Design a protein with these regions (language model features):
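Short, charged recognition helix plus adjacent turn
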Residues: 65-88
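A short, Lys/Arg-rich alpha-helix, primarily the initiator
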Residues: 1-16
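Helix-turn-helix DNA-binding elements, focusing on the entry/boundary residues of the two helices
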Residues: 10, 21, 32, 47-50
């Protein structure tokens, strides 16, 4: 599922940066458990939160996702808009 892939990718990138979940959370101006909750599938960041995470990690949003994740995301978005109608 998309959310699990997101959580795993975040943990992977954070560990590559060599920072704890707590320190990353606090650096982003969030509660101590913010990143931990995301990595353990208890929460998802807002779109703005996602952009802050990418900025903190020094990557672009597209670099966050691999091709398989992007396909899942596009599929999820397509399903959402088909179900809820397209808004202009």
């Amino acid at each position: 599922m998309y959310y699990e892939g997101f959580s795993k990718r975040l943990a992977e990138l954070r560990q590559e940066k060599g920072v704890s979940a707590r320190d990353m959370s606090l650096s982003l101006g969030q509660s101590e458990s913010y990143i931990n909750k995301i990595e353990n599938n208890y929460a998802m960041p807002s779109m703005q939160g996602f952009f802050y995470i990418c900025e903190y990690l020094g990557i672009t949003p597209s670099e966050f996702f691999n091709e398989e994740d992007l396909k899942d995301l596009y599929d999820d978005l397509y399903t959402y808009f088909e179900k809820n109608g397209k808004h202009h």
